Design a protein with these regions (language model features):
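Membrane-interface extramembranous regions
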Residues: 2-137
Length: 137
């Protein structure tokens, strides 16, 4: 039985869609859980923010933004809003890396934010055409 190039293309498209949804759901879950923990000032997050030198009210702001980003990533339509959510998450995760480096934390503290940066970039790169902007910005 021969597989046509059309069959390979459809299989590739299906794998890409599955990879998109896996990365996006994982990212959105992190946003919702992390957002709630930040907005509600979960004690481990409080300790981390104090260690990094940030004011605690910043947790509420970031927590709400995280929740909104998680909803935006999963919601149908609104491709521009999704672009903003992805950008905000990348800014946040790379900012977390910079903050941990600035206070002299070890390499292991960078694994989480680097992993989530990669997840955000992967989700963004894999998104289907229905979730992309129709034109260049």
């Amino acid at each position: 039985m021969r597989t046509t190039s059309l069959g390979k293309s459809a299989a590739s498209s299906r794998r890409r869609t599955i990879a998109y949804w896996i990365t996006t759901v994982l990212l959105a879950l992190e946003c919702v859980v992390g957002g709630m923990m930040g907005a509600l000032h979960y004690h481990l997050y409080v300790r981390n923010m104090e260690h990094l030198g940030y004011p605690l009210y910043f947790m509420t702001i970031l927590g709400v933004w995280y929740l909104l980003a998680g909803v935006a990533l999963l919601a149908p339509r609104f491709p521009r809003l999704k672009e903003w959510a992805y950008a905000g998450l990348v800014f946040n995760y790379t900012g977390a890396v910079a903050s941990h480096v600035a206070v002299g934390d070890g390499v292991m503290t960078l694994v989480g934010p680097i992993t989530f940066t990669a997840l955000a970039v992967a989700s963004w790169a894999l998104r289907p055409s229905t979730r992309r902007l129709d034109h260049d910005i």
